[in-house]
Each structure stands twice: as C-alpha cells, then as structure tokens.
C-alpha cells in the first residue's frame, strides 16, 4: 500500500496530475497488489501475455482459456476484484517485445515500424492496439542507437495513414473493455517459475555463468524478511510514542522525501505528531521513518535477478539493509547487525574470495555507513584543496564552519577547526572538532571527535600550533594520536568522488614533471630512433615506451588546444607511425569527440556564425584524418535540425553569416558591399555543404 501511495504522490508532484496507470516491477502480480492499485485510483496496469488465464466477453458465461501466451493483446480487459472494484489490464505483444529485446529489431527503424504495424490483423473486428513492453535500456544501452530506430519508427507510423499513436489512457477512454479476464497470480514477465527468481534457485539467470548456482537467493530473502519483520513492530511501538498512527505517517512520508525543507517537515509533524516534539523526539521520529523507507528499498527486484551474491545489484540491497540497521541502532538502541549477518552467512557466494553474505556485508556495506564523524573528516581533508565558505553542502549534509585556521610551512599544512554537521534527512546535528596535517602529496593524517569542553579543543589547537611552528612534525602527529586516538582519518576517508578528484589534483604536479622528463628524453633520442628505423633495426622496448608516452601526450595536448593545428597533428601522426608507436585510441578519440561536440553545440546555438561553421568543418577534417574512428552520433544529433532546415532558411542564414563575417578585427561592422555579401553567402553555403557531407547527411536538403 505504502509504495503505491508513494508512486501516485511522486507522479503528481512531478507532472501536476494523478497517474492513470502504474507499472508493476517485473510485472509481478497478485490480487492484493491489484486491489492496492485500484484503491488508489489506478485505472490500469500492463502484464505479460503468459500471465493471462482466461477471458470472456461481457454478457457471456463462457470462459475461454488463453493460457500459454494465447491472449489477444490488441484490446483492453477488465478484471473484477474481491472488493467489487475493477481494474483494466493490457497484455503487451510478446513476440514483438521479444524481437526488440533479443532479436535485433532495433537495428533497422523501418523494420521496427513494419513489425509494430504487423501487430494488427485483418481477422480481428473493431479497434486494435499494437503495443510492446521492454526495458528502457534497450533503446541505446543494450542496442546501440536503438533510440534512433524508435524515433524513426514512431515518425514513420505517425506520418502514415495505417495507424495513429495513442496511449493507454486515451485508448481506454475511446475503447473501454468489453471482455473480463482472470490472471495467474504470483507470476512475472521475467521468471518462468512465477516469482521464484526472487526467493530461490529456480534456474532463471543471465546464462553468463552456467557453472554457478543461485542458492544464495533463499537465505538472502530470509535475512531481509527477518530484518523487515523485526523492524516493523519496533517501528509501530516506538513510533507510536510520537506519531498518532505510525503507518499512516509512513504513507505520508513521501511528502517529506520529495521536499526535505524545514517547512515541509514541520507541516508533516504538525499533522501526524501526538504532541509538539522536542528536538530529540523529532530526530528519532524521522530516523524511524527513514528506517522504514530503507526497509522497503532493500527489496529492490534487481537484488535477486542476476547470478552472483557479490554483484553490484545485490550489494546495493545490502546497503539499503545496512542503512536500516544503522538507523535502528540510533533510533531504537538495538544492534541488529550481528543477527542479520548470522543469517547472511547461509548465503554462499559462487566466488571463493567472497565466501558468503556475511563477509560481503562486512567488507563493503559496514565500512560505507555514513556518520557525522566521516562527513567532518571529509570536510577537513577536502578543505585543504578547495576554499569552503562559512556554510557548505556535502551530499545530504549541511556543514557550518564554527572555527577554522590554517598554518603553512613550505609544502606542509596544518588545519584545525570545528564544524556543525546537520543531516538534511533526519535533521540530526553534531558539532565536532578536527585537525588535519598535510605533509605533501598523498600524506594526510588527522582526527575528528566531539569536544564536550571547548577549552579542551582550544588547548589542542594551541598545542598543535606550537609544535607546528617549531617544525616538530613528529610532535604534531603525536598530539593528534593522543587527542583523537581511534577517531583518525586520512585521504582514504574521503567519499569516493571527492577522493578521486583530490588524488587527481595531487597527481597533476607529479604527472607534469614526469611527462616533461619523458618528452625531453624522447626529443634527445628521436634522431637515433629515426636512424634505427631507416636501417630497419629493431628499436629497444624502453625507447618505444618513451616514444609512446611522449607522442601520445603531445597528440593529446594538440587536440586540446583551442585552435587545433591540423598540420601539427598530422606531423605527430606521421612520427608515431614512423616509430611504430601504438596510439592511445580510446583517450584520443574521447578528446576529439568532445571537441567536435562542443563545436557542434556552438553551431547549433548560432547557425549564422560563419566562424563557428568553419571551425566545425576544420575539426571534422582533422577527425577524418585520424587513424581511428571518431564517434559522430552526438555531433550529428546537435547539428541535424540546423542542417535539415538550412535550405529552407538558407538565404536569411547566409546573409546573416555574410554580415557576421564582415566584422573587422576590432569587433566593428563594416558595411558589406553587394559583391562581398554575395561572396560571404557563397562561402557559408560551401561550408554548410561540406559539414553536411562530413557528418554523413548526404540526403539532407
């Protein structure tokens, strides 16, 4: 019930109206689920054809068996529920959906359109619906350029006179069901055994590792069920101390999830709280509700779908469980981690390195739990590399600086301060003191903890400053160890994205120095390399390595220049070929592609800018001369509308381009003569034709 309510409210918040239909994950269905949909005003959902059991026409008493994918997918059906409510059901076209997902139907937009139209039949009477259900990833991720095939197919159908595009709501409005249907309960579209894929080793898997088993699914399910059933009564009992109806509050908690502002939280608590809550009660109540949120998230279907317990999808559901356990520890005072891990121990990984669910949980989930200490440690370290203001946001935490000072001596820096950390999710606040010592490069050490007595914090600050100003680095480290003991951190304590950014900053100087040295080595040895090549003498591997690093680096820099020198690029390519250097095609292609996309975007914004058009033409020439393929898809998409409409608006655009081209070096416009204007228009047209040709728009007029 809660998840259906959340889905309805989320849709309404984003689109300004209530939804008419709702997709069931994996089309997994039973009657209570359909009752929950109908109760919230959902008119329809979509199922797989094999989930239909039997149908009968309105007014008829004769049921027709349609099991085994034999239902007619071209109409809507009505299902009568035990509550006397009804819900409409659509059953997608199985063969066409299968063709999209697994048979390469998206390789050809025309064939895709024809197949969709082939879903209609002259043997049927009345209006027909041709429709499919597939993963969204099919269009571009699983099938490269699948979104283009979809676009072509929809445009082709829309421009023809055989059918018109519609949606389920409109079709229901125009052609209400005239057949009843009954379904097979506890079935889905992706498990031949009903819904066993989400609780047992039923045999359904990706097929990528036939030697593996999925015996881990059952104990994983049991562990999560135990956690859910342990948290639910505790939530009801403890939540009842501050909430009139904890379960009704959970239903409405979606309003807070969608808007974490203090105003929304206050309005939510005003509606549901038994009394005006103090700060501690408010924080505990929000933690309980967030605990329930994660107790639902941990049932995300992909956690069981794939083959291995240590897969990222399954680890993610364990992360959700870990968050629920962490919140339970804070809000209920109960530590459920060990009994949960005992149950996970029965879930065996197919990979010896991971053993079982307990080891996976302790290796990846437990260390990732975010606390105010970790946020403060992240703030302290990252503050050495970027200037934070008095207030900053780190993910879902607001950090307010209370005190902060930095001492510098050469490459060594010492930062000491305190900050108030507030969770935007639970509104929990902590004020923590920190100190961090950066010895240069990646050598960072520090500590963070709560100081009940501010005088103790100030004493620490003065001790550290004294030791630092006396160049007593060992003394600084000793003081940090004494005051922070186990609450220490390093660059490893940073959240992953920021960790990589800072490591890249640290590496820049080292890389720059190394690259300069290697380039100098190559330039010194280049004549010898040419001589060896002229004699067909094998070049020593060490020389080839130096040449590879130097030439790939120079090419990278050449392609990154604001105005790429085509001759310089060609010269470097010839030199690489002469020295038998393997180009770093992946990195160079990415750089060239991004340059093209940037220039294509500039042309898309200003199609009358002759200079932008010329730069795009030049970049396309350079890309064509590279000894590897450069992807043009995004550049094509950016330019398509402009190129397709260029002929229709050609004169106006050409005149504007000619006028733009007449600007002198001071940015002033000289009045163009008719002759100059004609020449400018002709130049723009030539450039446009060249760009169109190089982007492979041969038929665009």
Name the predicted role of every residue range:
Residues 26-29, 48-51, 94-96, 136-138:
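Active-site-proximal loop/turn and secondary-structure-junction residues that shape catalytic pockets
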Residues 63-386, 408-425, 437-444, 449-513:
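Active-site and substrate-binding clefts of carbohydrate-active enzymes
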Residues 2-24, 117-133:
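CE4/NodB-like, metal-dependent polysaccharide N-deacetylase domain
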Residues 525-654, 677-701:
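Extended alpha-helical scaffold segments
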Residues 649-651, 660-668, 674-676:
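Asparagine/serine/threonine-enriched low-complexity, disordered tracts
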Residues 2-17, 38-81, 156-160, 192-193:
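Acidic, His- and aromatic-enriched active-site or binding-groove loops in soluble protein domains
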Residues 50-52, 56-71, 384-412:
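Extended, Lys/Arg-enriched charged tracts that mediate electrostatic binding to polyanionic substrates
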